[in-house]
């Protein structure tokens, strides 16, 4: 902890190993700008000495043989950039790497997604008494222990939203997955009322609790999620779904929701929307992490669930 205001230039985080162990690394998928990507990739099975010198996101697993594995994780990431690692080759070392603090940003025209165009020469600005993220080496003797390890959850900050009995977990019917492509139906499939009523009917028949209205229910180029396209009547869809026991989740972009946060939460919660699928963060610098917390606080206050997509690992 530290009481005064600080600018944090960098953090030295090293993980040194005595041998050339096998390692499983998920590399960044963006070779040009490795800090900007969706945090989704297959794992590359290699050794510490043969691993590529490029950024990998967490979790990363080191194989100690005889069934023992160490998984590098992070917990309680708040108001701070997330950690990547990069292999140091023959040194049998993984070096922590952190996104610098954004200096300037711009927006992609198609969906108004914010991206960093210039970075500062430091990683964080912070003030007041605080703690910093946990860095975890979770030891397992069997692979079946890995997915049930609860250290990230156990080391995270306690629940801040109080009563969370309003949160309803469940499955979702997802329009984007098959590009709204319905065959053998007596209407033109697409982002329209007939298509979404069909999805609601499908969800009801198969005990699926939600449907998502993915990209296109508002004009993504506008960056305005308060204005629904004229082909859709959300009030009617919500009522139709309610009568069949199916709730609706709306897709949006992180910074678009953040820019209209209170208005969007109030409007759609009052209408009966149950949550947001929030997409295309593709960053974990300090400002991006702060945005996630703002969104989580506001949506929880309005009893809206969150489905976070295109985001860094859970902490």
Each language-model region and where it sits:
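Tryptophan-centered motif/residue detector
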Residues: 24-26, 174-177, 217, 251
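An acidic-aromatic substrate-binding cleft motif
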Residues: 123-202, 206
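Aromatic- and carboxylate-enriched substrate-binding clefts and catalytic-loop regions
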Residues: 214-315
């Amino acid at each position: 902890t530290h009481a005064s205001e600080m600018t944090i230039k960098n953090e030295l985080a090293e993980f040194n190993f005595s041998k050339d162990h096998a390692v499983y690394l998920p590399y960044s998928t963006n070779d040009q700008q490795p800090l900007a990507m969706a945090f989704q990739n297959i794992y590359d099975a290699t050794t510490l000495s043969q691993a590529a010198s490029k950024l990998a996101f967490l979790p990363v697993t080191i194989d100690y043989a005889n069934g023992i594995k160490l998984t590098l994780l992070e917990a309680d990431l708040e108001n701070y950039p997330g950690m990547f690692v990069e292999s140091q080759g023959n040194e049998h070392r993984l070096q922590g790497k952190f996104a610098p603090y954004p200096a300037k940003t711009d927006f992609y025209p198609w969906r108004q997604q914010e991206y960093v165009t210039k970075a500062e020469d430091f990683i964080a600005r912070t003030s007041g008494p605080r703690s910093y993220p946990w860095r975890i080496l979770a030891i397992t003797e069997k692979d079946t222990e890995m997915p049930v390890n609860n250290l990230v959850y156990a080391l995270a900050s306690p629940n801040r939203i109080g009563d969370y009995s309003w949160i309803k977990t469940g499955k979702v019917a997802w329009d984007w997955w098959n590009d709204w492509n319905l065959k053998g139906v007596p209407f033109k499939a697409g982002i329209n009322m007939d298509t979404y009523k069909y999805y609601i009917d499908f969800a009801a028949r198969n005990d699926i609790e939600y449907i998502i209205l993915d990209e296109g229910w508002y004009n993504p180029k506008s960056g305005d999620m308060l204005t629904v396209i004229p082909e859709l009547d959300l009030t009617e869809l919500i009522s139709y779904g309610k009568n069949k026991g199916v709730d609706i989740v709306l897709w949006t972009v992180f910074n678009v929701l953040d820019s209209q946060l209170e208005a969007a939460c109030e409007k759609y919660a009052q209408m009966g929307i149950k949550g947001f699928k929030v997409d295309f963060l593709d960053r974990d610098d300090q400002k991006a992490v702060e945005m996630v917390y703002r969104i989580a606080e506001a949506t929880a206050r309005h009893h809206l669930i969150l489905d976070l997509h295109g985001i860094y690992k859970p902490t």
